[in-house]
């Protein structure tokens, strides 16, 4: 493959977030570590996705900002029969100009004028999400509660979308890579399947000064999905400073987040931050968050717990931890 290409479709109107454009664009840019082409994206789209005025322009520039060198719409005109009759193109069924057509034309006119300045935009990101197809397969076979085939992708999206909302740009890297030194922070979602040399490379990157964020279901089985027979997480136990040997689905379990993690942008937490030891003054704000889909029953070795489970039985187990390992 010389140039990566992709199709990116997503909700619109009041449900337009930019999350899908960023996540899918980052995957495409990272395939060749270079610019890519958006070969298909929605014009009018399906019935629920007809864009508000201005959204087509916002979406187009979002694609370019992620490193795309093109925005191509599916499709030119809306077709008149078969299954995609209501997957609307730039033109409707009457072939006449409409608001979507006029907005697309104005985008094209802009790019005819300034396109040379928008082509081949480059990024130098300091964070990367590591993706693994074997782990995707593993979590399809042994899914998280209620998520089924979407278990792995859902966890990856949680992390990617969190970075997006924090305005932290990131790359995607393959689990085939072993040198993570070009990134300050490596983010590893649900690495259910991993070879020992990959787990060692991740551990070494932290020891040498990198930062690692990882989730439950990481370091659990080898590349053939055979579960490792020692204490979990395999090889990463010392790096993370934790261990566990049991796990379950959370039922009526929640966690109480520290003030700085719960809603850091609300005025009540800003006031609390300036008054050591105080809690949020905004009565509508809550620090409680419900646990969903999976819980590892984690015991801290050298790690420091950030918070525990709110549950009469599981309260002794850490829900999230932080650890110093080597230089990282």
Language-model segment annotations:
Residues 2-328:
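Carbohydrate-binding surfaces of carbohydrate-active enzymes
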């Amino acid at each position: 493959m010389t140039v990566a290409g992709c199709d990116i479709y997503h909700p619109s109107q009041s449900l337009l977030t930019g999350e899908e454009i960023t996540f899918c664009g980052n995957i495409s840019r990272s395939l060749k570590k270079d610019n890519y082409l958006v070969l298909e994206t929605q014009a009018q789209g399906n019935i629920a996705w007809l864009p508000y005025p201005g959204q087509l322009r916002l979406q187009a520039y979002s694609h370019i900002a992620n490193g795309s060198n093109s925005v191509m719409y599916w499709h030119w005109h809306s077709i008149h029969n078969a299954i995609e009759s209501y997957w609307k193109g730039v033109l409707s069924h009457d072939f006449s100009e409409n608001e979507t057509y006029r907005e697309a034309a104005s985008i094209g006119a802009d790019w005819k004028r300034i396109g040379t300045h928008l082509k081949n935009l480059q990024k130098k990101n300091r964070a990367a999400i590591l993706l693994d197809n074997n782990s995707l397969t593993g979590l399809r076979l042994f899914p998280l509660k209620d998520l089924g085939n979407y278990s792995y992708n859902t966890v990856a999206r949680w992390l990617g979308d969190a970075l997006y909302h924090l305005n932290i740009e990131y790359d995607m890297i393959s689990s085939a890579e072993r040198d993570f030194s070009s990134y300050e922070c490596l983010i590893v979602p649900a690495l259910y399947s991993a070879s020992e040399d990959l787990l060692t490379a991740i551990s070494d990157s932290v020891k040498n000064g990198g930062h690692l964020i990882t989730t439950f279901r990481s370091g659990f089985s080898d590349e053939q999905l055979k579960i490792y027979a020692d204490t979990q997480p395999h090889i990463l136990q010392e790096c993370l400073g934790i261990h566990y040997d049991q796990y379950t689905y959370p039922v009526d379990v929640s966690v109480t987040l520290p003030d700085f993690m719960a809603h850091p942008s609300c005025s009540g937490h800003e006031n609390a931050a300036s008054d050591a030891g105080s809690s949020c003054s905004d009565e509508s704000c809550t620090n409680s968050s419900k646990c969903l889909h999976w819980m590892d029953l984690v015991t801290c070795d050298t790690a420091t717990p950030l918070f525990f489970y709110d549950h009469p039985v599981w309260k002794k187990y850490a829900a999230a931890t932080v650890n110093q390992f080597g230089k990282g």
